[in-house]
């Protein structure tokens, strides 16, 4: 007998933008989604700012989006937690951060502050770095080196020079700190096991084995003139730098885990085999948040706050079979983040990881692995064993981040083809498909200045129900999706899940 599965399809980076200028979603030929949107109950829901536990006006992101969707409630994010701790002063008494400072005092060693130098608020925030500099000054630490990971994805592609200049001014005001290395996030924040990139950052930090610069801002200016934007700055070293040495402290101030794991493991994991480490300094390493539950030899400054009864746990306790499926670049989002930031695999939960294509940037293959994901999922649906399926298509986000408009259009069209196949298959089984997104991106590819626009947008995202006649309310948010799914599946909503179903009674 055929199962009647409920499929939650998350089209990463698919926002609603009424302005068609620079809008790859509006420009794409998407007959399936156009038909689905026209013929089925639909609403638009909040995926940014206060709706997802971020500061008002702050763009959402994939980690935040999937956490809120899986939790079925507004989850207050690490950006807010850390910023509040700075404001109330508790940041400066944080035990892990104090330990890092005390280690430097005890060993007369250097403090290295490493992270994404940006106000994007997706992986880090530069105000958190400034607070660490102030703390170092208060502790009387003299040797403080900043390793500047440049953004160009969550903010403008050439905003990095301004962030460097602001940092230099802050260090002058506070009275401590020198820029040691500068590197694009393409190298330092890989999450796809492309360790040749990470190695360049590691060698720059530990051996100063990289091109040298006298003035960071001037180096950035030259990079722009050479056509190299922030994200792709090849790791380089200041004339004032000292390498990371035995006894030094490192505080990695990114609060989002996924792109901080590889470089952290290179420093702390004795079994790390991503590349041969010429030097392995024994350091006192602080992660701003928990990057991995089993990360060895680190302290965590802001430990995770547990999310009780996320959607996956509800399914498991109801005795249902569930499947999580995505390509590699979004696999953590439908598993770790969807499960409330925990590595737990629930009873009855299966996971399928499809490799992402091995290309330098995803505009070179805008379909990514969407067709492989879809082919695999079609076969799994036809096995008739799953009650609930959580799926992510990465294309609109990952290709959107490249800033290449024509490629983003192709990405949308690939997702359209795949969603059309899956909706028809689920319908043939008598099942229900819910279509949504975690945040916007491909809905704005060109900025007001006419240059490529690579960050996420703050636009609302679609929520569509196919195969379950109903009326949907307005004013919802991502945290309302799980309660809606539970209502459709006739499952009780746990009291911990404070979101409200989008279905009008």
Show where each model-derived region lies.
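Feature captures the catalytic ectodomains and active-site-proximal regions of enzymes
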Residues: 1-505
